[in-house]
From Swiss-Prot:
Subunit field text: Heterotrimer of UreA (gamma), UreB (beta) and UreC (alpha) subunits. Three heterotrimers associate to form the active enzyme.
GO process terms (BP): urea catabolic process
Record organism: Rhodopseudomonas palustris (strain BisA53)
Top enzyme class: hydrolase
Principal cellular location given in the protein's record: cytoplasm
Catalysed reactions, semicolon-separated: urea + 2 H2O + H(+) = hydrogencarbonate + 2 NH4(+)
InterPro entries linked: Urease_beta-like (IPR002019), Urease_betasu_sf (IPR036461), Urease_subunit (IPR050069)
GO CC list: urease complex
Name of the protein: Urease subunit beta
Pathway terms, separated by semicolons: Nitrogen metabolism; urea degradation; CO(2) and NH(3) from urea (urease route): step 1/1
Length: 101
């Protein structure tokens, strides 16, 4: 085995099965690119990203763990978000929640 090597079985794996999702239109109104990681609480992203923040509370990007989405200046794109799991408590990030959702 090589360090970091994967042994993947044939077939498909459904990620985030059964969790609530929402699709939002997100615009970068800033003058610099903004990158958001897979497990960042989307509600608390950079204020230059314009979208329905209330709909994003308790959600993260519905993408593979360890990856990210980049928003170029002036770019608008749709993203799918998925509900956070576990205890549904959020601490850190920008400090906008600091507790239960």
């Amino acid at each position: 085995m090589i360090p970091g090597e994967y042994f993947i079985k044939d077939g498909e794996i459904e990620l985030n099965a059964g969790r609530d999702t929402v699709t939002l239109s997100v615009a970068n109104s800033g003058d610099r690119p903004i990158q958001v990681g897979s497990h960042y609480h989307f509600f608390e992203t950079n204020p230059a990203l314009q979208f329905d923040r209330a709909a994003a509370r308790g959600m993260r990007l519905d993408i593979v763990a360890g990856t990210a989405v980049r928003f170029e200046p002036g770019q608008t794109r749709e993203v799918q978000l998925v509900a956070l799991a576990g205890k549904r408590e959020v601490y850190g990030f920008r400090g906008d929640v600091m507790g239960k959702l």
